Amino acid sequence: MVGYAMGHSRPTMQFRKENPVLSIVNGIIIDLPAPANLSYMWNFGSLLGVCLVVQMATGIFLAMHYCSDVSLAFASVDHIMRDVNYGFLLRYFHANGASMFFLCLYFHVGRGIYYGSYTKVEVWNVGVVLFILTMATAFLGYVLPWGQMSFWGATVITNLLSAIPYVGTDIVQWVWGGFSVSNATLNRFFSLHYLLPFVLAALGVVHLICLHVSGSNNPIGVRSDLDKVPFHTYYTSKDWYGIVAFVLFFCSLVYLAPNLLGDPENFIQANPLVTPVHIQPEWYFLFAYAILRSIPNKLGGVVAMFASLLILFLLPWVHTSRLRGLTFRPLARVAFWFMVTDFMLLTWIGCQPVEEPFIIVGQLASVFFFAYFLVLSPLLGYLENLLLFPKKG
């Protein structure tokens, strides 16, 4: 039986290694050499792939029934909820899938910062581009239901482009397709929201190819060329375990509290004549929104908001430690958890009204956010080099 099994598996193995298409898949997710000590924190990459598939599948079916017209958009969402078979599930899986996507994304980025994965520059840079494009895709999608928060969120965020000197107003009108957020705006947002997930999928493949070239990082941050295992079955089984746990949590959210992370204002149809009391984006944008609000100057706020994302590109260049990750760096580890707390504080501040004491707390939290990347990260690396690797003699 063993001989039969081995003889039977050899043609399959040969086929997957020699076939021009399957050989690429084989190199990326089957025979990929992976460090033997990866923890469950490395599961979030596969979970992001699952989230993207769920979002694309539910999004395609939702698009079959959605109308990108300002007079029909809100009603078409209502039609999906009431009249389309399992339309309510499609919508709730898509809406909450975005939240799960960003939850996994923030864990994935946090793990990369903690374990120093940014030292693999190509993989990291493609990942940051993916992160920014995902935020753009989510923003475009949030506008589509054409509720109050959708309309006013689109108005406020697109208006930020007017802060660009000289050409800002022209850019805003070009984005709107007119002199205000209108039917042209909704149409182009829907078109781009449908397109960008396919761009994300393509960039995801590029991300994997870069990872295949440079190799995976690991929890202790040392070279692991002599201690590697094939990705399948060692890590595919681990990924499946994570996927099952994720699906249980995701389904619990969708079935038991589908509107928990939504905004009640978005159940009211968009009305350009009535401004909501408090305009705020979805929870996964709140940290950047809090940074935007913390700076009184409009252009300064816009620059700070975009800088809060683009600053991730600088991490490989501000890394001064001789150690890759924070596993053996006591000072930097404390600073990292302060930064995580600061991120959550900014998220909370972003959903609070613009009044004291929230304004000053938001400003202090914003200062610490940038100080972590630009000051603490290189400074603590330098200090730890002196403490952990003292010069002899």
Swiss-Prot record:
Localization per Swiss-Prot or TrEMBL: Mitochondrion inner membrane
Q: Entry's SUPFAM superfamilies?
A: a domain/subunit of cytochrome bc1 complex (Ubiquinol-cytochrome c reductase), Transmembrane di-heme cytochromes
What membrane topology does this protein have?
Multi-pass membrane protein
What biological processes does GO assign it?
Answer: mitochondrial electron transport, ubiquinol to cytochrome c
Binding residues annotated for a ubiquinone, in chain numbering:
212
| Annotated keywords | Electron transport, Heme, Iron, Membrane, Metal-binding, Mitochondrion, Mitochondrion inner membrane, Respiratory chain, Transmembrane, Transmembrane helix, Transport, Ubiquinone
User: Which cysteines bridge via disulfide bonds?
Assistant: none
Pfam families, sorted: Cytochrom_B_C, Cytochrome_B
Tell me which residues bind heme b b562: 94, 193
Q: How is the cofactor bound?
A: Binds 2 heme b groups non-covalently.
Q: Which GO terms describe its molecular function?
A: metal ion binding; ubiquinol-cytochrome-c reductase activity
UniProt entry tagged with the keyword Electron transport: yes
> Residues that bind heme b b566, according to the entry?
108, 207
Say yes or no: keyword Transcription present: no
Assembly, in brief, is: The main subunits of complex b-c1 are: cytochrome b, cytochrome c1 and the Rieske protein.
Q: Which family does it belong to?
A: Belongs to the cytochrome b family.
Q: What else is known?
A: Heme 1 (or BL or b562) is low-potential and absorbs at about 562 nm, and heme 2 (or BH or b566) is high-potential and absorbs at about 566 nm.
Primary role? Component of the ubiquinol-cytochrome c reductase complex (complex III or cytochrome b-c1 complex) that is part of the mitochondrial respiratory chain. The b-c1 complex mediates electron transfer from ubiquinol to cytochrome c. Contributes to the generation of a proton gradient across the mitochondrial membrane that is then used for ATP synthesis.
What's the protein called, per UniProt?
Cytochrome b
- The source organism is Metridium senile (Brown sea anemone)
